[in-house]
């Protein structure tokens, strides 16, 4: 189980310095946090000069603390007219402050600075501050040109689980005598595996133990004058005298032309379109229907919420990461003027028994889930909130709700602007990579419909076929939903899920569903499916009577989920199955990083019933992989959804030839 996050306690000394009672140390010099950040970390890493030569520049910090190093770096980037196009700041923090404590600490610090543009940044940071849950949280500022990737957890655990290429390291944190773990050889070995060949570092300490650990990990150091009269600090660069890593950190996809094809204009594909366009890629979106979001993404509404499990398993961690990232992206779309239809009053998940309710309540307590993410709801509280009878209590997801998927897809395409070209009513039969390294999307006659440096297959169950994948087991699962006329169902004020779901729509109509029918290809709504949905609704909300309606007279819709055999999505660069077959004997013990890849070919499919939760995170992961940026989730989670995981399993069992 993932360790719960214990927030930092905000304490000020008499001189105004922020201090940690847990570690008995100060967060910054009494001579000024921002001046210290500039002298030690910004100037110590040769900034801003060094980032002027990069399209994107990545910094890793080993302790976020009050956020002053990030704020100072962000302000320096803003003030530099020759700054890099995109700045990535990745920071690890075991004990993050709660939102308002962070705001107070940072505001107190910047109140005494002469860096005038920095004060407004404090509120931007605090307003975007995430829920204090373990894992990776990606925040964007300045229209996405500045990205803060926060990693909440113990650095010893989380640093080996990151996927990125760092240009600079801010080695910060409490003094080695106060928090020895953060300065241990294991930390520096993890950083060495993430370092660019030209990476630099800076730190305020010059302790002998730190120097030895740096040297052992392949970092060359030298002493320079410290801050505010401190005799010495250390700066240096990654300069290994021997091989210190088996695998190189991620690099950007190499191409002279930043153009891409996305096949499939549902939730998965449109999310990818928006993320690539935001990075300057020109995207051709190909959809076999005449309009976008016509298939499963054309449902009147879909629900979104995280999954909570007592053991905080992979699926739960992925759904939490996807849920929180989706909320961040959707708010950014709305701030940019790209509105879509979604509810904002929360979602209730009801237990199916008293025992299940107790397990749900205990899970929240054991995991330390913040109330802003989920809270237990007694039966009486659920009745009062929903204004109808319920059989059991459950969870309230205060930020959950429902969305019209088609309006979200339209908003994402609108955000892409003139970087998006659409081709609709055309079905792609196969993909082909030419001798020039560019991919061509061909129709059944062999005609080239579009060509580009990169292709993302995001067309659900057809993705594996188009990409020529034999080792990507997915299944089409029929789902029928039912529309209930006004006044025929309890008028709940927000979506309710449990054994099925119920969503209030406009004009008093209620949506309920959905059936789960593997390998059933009938696209026509059936009376039996409506009856099943009505019976499920009766169990969910006892005030409803399934027999009160004529199932044969109801309207509805059928969509098809694409579900992988392990129930997790397939997101990321695809494996090159032909190359793997040629090298099968050497790859029987391969790991995912050893598998040959289909250069420039990516997948975003197999989202099942969780497209709203996973699509935004999947799109961000693909865009980050393509552009060589820090990944928006831990490597362990990225590998759990790597499309090549099934190829690796087949190689291990000798099924690839």
Curated annotation (Swiss-Prot):
User: What keyword terms does UniProt attach to this protein?
Assistant: Cytoplasm, FAD, Flavoprotein, Methyltransferase, Multifunctional enzyme, Oxidoreductase, S-adenosyl-L-methionine, Transferase, tRNA processing
InterPro entries associated with the record = FAD-dep_OxRdtase, FAD/NAD-bd_sf, MnmC-like_methylTransf, SAM-dependent_MTases_sf, tRNA_MAMT_biosynth_bifunc_MnmC, tRNA_MNMC2, tRNA_S-uridine_synth_MnmC_C
Q: What is its EC number?
A: 2.1.1.61, 1.5.-.-
Which Gene Ontology cellular component terms are annotated? cytoplasm
Family matches, as SUPFAM superfamilies? FAD-linked reductases, C-terminal domain, FAD/NAD(P)-binding domain
Chain ranges passing through the membrane:
none
Q: Which Pfam families match?
A: DAO, Methyltransf_30
Its cofactor is: FAD
Q: Where is this region: FAD-dependent cmnm(5)s(2)U34 oxidoreductase?
A: 263-657
On whether Oxidoreductase is a keyword of this UniProt record, the answer is yes
Where found in the cell? Answer: Cytoplasm
Its BP terms in the Gene Ontology are: methylation; tRNA wobble base modification
Q: In which domain of life is the source organism classified?
A: Bacteria
Q: Which reaction does it catalyse?
A: 5-aminomethyl-2-thiouridine(34) in tRNA + S-adenosyl-L-methionine = 5-methylaminomethyl-2-thiouridine(34) in tRNA + S-adenosyl-L-homocysteine + H(+)
Q: Which intervals of the chain are annotated as region tRNA (mnm(5)s(2)U34)-methyltransferase?
A: 1-239
GO terms, molecular function: flavin adenine dinucleotide binding; oxidoreductase activity, acting on the CH-NH group of donors; tRNA (5-methylaminomethyl-2-thiouridylate)(34)-methyltransferase activity
Please report which protein family the annotation says this sequence is part of.
In the N-terminal section; belongs to the methyltransferase superfamily. tRNA (mnm(5)s(2)U34)-methyltransferase family.
Annotated function = Catalyzes the last two steps in the biosynthesis of 5-methylaminomethyl-2-thiouridine (mnm(5)s(2)U) at the wobble position (U34) in tRNA. Catalyzes the FAD-dependent demodification of cmnm(5)s(2)U34 to nm(5)s(2)U34, followed by the transfer of a methyl group from S-adenosyl-L-methionine to nm(5)s(2)U34, to form mnm(5)s(2)U34.
Q: What is this protein called?
A: tRNA 5-methylaminomethyl-2-thiouridine biosynthesis bifunctional protein MnmC
Gene that this polypeptide is encoded by:
mnmC
